[in-house]
From Swiss-Prot:
Protein name per UniProt: Glutamyl endopeptidase
EC number from the UniProt entry: 3.4.21.19
Residue ranges the record assigns to the propeptide: 31-94
Native organism: Bacillus licheniformis (strain ATCC 14580 / DSM 13 / JCM 2505 / CCUG 7422 / NBRC 12200 / NCIMB 9375 / NCTC 10341 / NRRL NRS-1264 / Gibson 46)
Catalytic activity: Preferential cleavage: Glu-|-Xaa, Asp-|-Xaa
Length: 316
């Protein structure tokens, strides 16, 4: 039998609990994901889910977005060589490790090199890579300046640029995308995308990209882009194995330099057959820092994969 005192104490305890709750002690809400998309376009509404079209494949190892070669039709223009300082990376840009083993890409009209783009904006000079007809993947610091808290002005994007030669001309940016985590300068979220004014990807093609939770140590990859220590607008590459495979970063000893930020870290002949061609595993972001002897790129995680896919889809 329950005593009257016990009932009374229970009622008082309940009333106190209700009073405290009503004074603002509400259940804690989950913090927004640092991968939540942010755009330079105020009208942009971030997707809360992702749609995988038939070009997205999956297997027991992960997800894959298929590559596309494009038509390759050249529309060459000659322009004055532009010299602009590389965009400031969050850490060291002096990323040549030992001897410089980069080699110049002399035929930038060959796929996939024509799908690698030179980016020039108010932030500086960078590299990017096509992931769809109108979408370029790049580093977050190439399009959003954390020191000023602002996006870059309109960028000029030149696929397959080769010095003063622009085999496919140049196109302008229309808007930018980054994850919210990059606004605070957290390098785990140093990635983004550029939407273009024209579907140049139909001509130059675009890269596949993939997500996997498996270790990528030993995987042979290539980094190709537009370094600031070489003749302006020339593309250079270096291949080698991934040395360290982390949750958010991949580390490697391939030589890079400022201006190559945003370059694809990709498998040339992908063992990931669902990519159907060159397959990017990360976005190159920075050089040696923090006691490591390796350069680094932001790894394509499930969240990065979904953001790139949504940004690509929103441009079509």
């Amino acid at each position: 039998m329950v005593s009257k005192k016990s009932v009374k104490r229970g009622l008082i305890t309940g009333l106190i609990g209700i009073s405290i709750y009503s004074l603002g002690m509400h259940p804690a809400q989950a913090a927004p994901s640092p991968h939540t998309p942010v755009s330079s376009d105020p009208s942009y509404k971030a997707e809360t889910s992702v749609t995988y079209d038939p070009n997205i494949k999956s297997d027991q190892y992960g997800l894959y977005s298929k590559a596309f070669t494009g038509t390759g039709k050249v529309n060459e223009t000659k322009e004055k060589a532009e010299k602009k300082s590389p965009a400031k990376a969050p850490y060291s840009i002096k990323s040549v490790i030992g001897s410089d083993d980069r080699t110049r890409v002399t035929n930038t009209t060959a796929y996939p090199y024509r799908a690698i783009v030179h980016i020039s904006s108010s932030i500086g000079s960078c590299t990017g890579w096509m992931i769809g007809p109108k979408t370029v993947a790049t580093a977050g610091h190439c399009i959003y300046d954390t020191s000023s808290g602002s996006f870059a002005g309109t960028a000029t994007v030149s696929p397959g640029r080769n010095g003063t030669s622009y085999p496919y001309g140049s196109v302008k940016s229309t808007r930018y995308f980054i994850p919210s985590g990059w606004r605070s300068g957290n390098t785990n979220y140093d990635y983004g995308a550029i939407e273009l004014s024209e579907p140049i990807g139909n001509t130059v093609g675009y890269f596949g990209y993939s997500y996997t939770t498996s270790s990528l140590v030993g995987t042979t990859v290539t980094i190709s882009g537009y370094p600031g220590d070489k003749t302006a607008g020339t593309q250079w590459q270096h291949s080698g194995p991934i040395a360290i495979s982390e949750t958010y970063k991949l580390q490697y000893a391939m030589d890079t330099y400022g201006g190559q930020s945003g370059s694809p870290v990709f498998e040339q002949s992908s063992s990931r057959t669902n990519c159907s061609g060159p397959c990017s595993l990360a976005v190159h972001t920075n050089g040696v820092y923090g006691g490591s002897s390796y350069n680094r790129g932001t790894r394509i995680t499930k969240e990065v994969f979904d953001n790139l896919t949504n940004w690509k889809n929103s441009a079509q």
